[in-house]
A protein has these predicted regions:
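C-terminal beta-strand-loop-alpha-helix "lid" module of Rossmann-like NAD(P)-dependent dehydrogenases
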Residues: 1-286
Length: 286
């Protein structure tokens, strides 16, 4: 059995760690509420943008446009959104597993890493990191999202890449987050994604042309999805970290209870031993 001194040292160490996990949980809770509110404010716009593009493609007949077909290049850009810090449960590792477990050929991928954790993990696994940006995830802005999307879209229209994907964590609620890998370009709209109030039999004409309308709206569509993913990722990260720190705090409490019991047993044993020695000494004298 460990000595009382060793047990007290372990308890002190665990108590210090518990104070840290409690503080981190509190910070994550505050950040989560802020990020959650931001996501709730921006989601209606992004959903409307998606429905607009869905309706536009459904009502425009057959359109021959570069944004609607894969390029000749086999290269695929994948924007990977993770965090700069750990201690968030499986938040970062789930995104990495999503990439490594996908059908995408590693040799064809150009990784645009938003957040250090994803970059580090994929780099260790031999993926090519085309771009890294650790600052964007700390304070997402539509302007930064637009600047990166313009760069990737140019590579797409120039034929340097054939497809564009986005890997991020979808925020469902405080305790539920889902890693997702979606294709941004070429645009693929599922039939069920078109708003219910749209009549697919109605064709629309756009001025000056449908192709020129797509030239304007698709970049905004891609940027909107990307920015929305950034906002959801921040909320998911803080939700995951809050849960992880809550679990760590609870585990520390259980360990402290076990150590307290162990300490009391050791103390009781020491007292018993001392009494035994006193009684034995008294008996020897008498």
């Amino acid at each position: 059995m460990a000595s009382m001194k060793d047990i007290k040292r372990r308890k002190s160490s665990i108590q210090s760690t518990q104070q840290i996990t409690k503080a981190m949980k509190l910070v994550s809770t505050v950040k989560l509420q802020k990020a959650k509110g931001r996501a709730e404010q921006t989601n209606p716009y992004f959903n409307y943008m998606y429905q607009t593009v869905s309706s536009m493609l459904a009502k425009s007949g057959n359109i021959n446009h570069p944004y609607l077909k894969s390029g000749e290049s086999t290269k695929k850009a994948v924007v990977v959104i993770t965090s700069n810090r750990g201690l968030a449960g499986g938040y970062n590792s789930n995104i990495v597993k999503l990439i490594t477990g996908s059908d995408l050929n590693k040799d064809d991928l150009l990784i645009y890493a938003i957040g250090n954790k994803g970059r580090e993990a994929l780099e260790r696994r031999g993926y090519h990191i085309e771009l890294e940006d650790s600052a964007m995830i700390e304070s997402p802005s539509y302007e930064d999202a637009s600047a990166l999307c313009k760069k990737i879209l140019k590579s797409f229209t120039d034929g340097e890449i054939g497809e564009i994907y986005l890997a991020y964590t979808h925020f469902k609620n405080t305790v539920s987050h889902e890693p997702k890998l979606i294709k941004l370009l070429p645009v693929e709209i599922e039939a069920g994604d078109v708003a219910e109030d749209t009549d697919s039999n109605v064709l629309m004409n756009y001025e000056p042309t449908t192709e020129e309308a797509l030239d304007m709206i698709i970049p905004k569509y891609v940027t909107s999805l990307f920015y929305g993913a950034l906002v959801e990722a921040v909320a998911s990260e803080n939700g995951a970290r809050m849960q992880a720190m809550d679990s760590a705090t609870g585990n520390a409490e259980e360990m402290l209870e076990d150590l307290t019991l162990l300490y009391n047993r050791a103390r009781q044993g020491a007292i018993t031993q001392e009494l035994t020695e006193i009684i034995a000494g008294a008996s020897a004298i008498s």
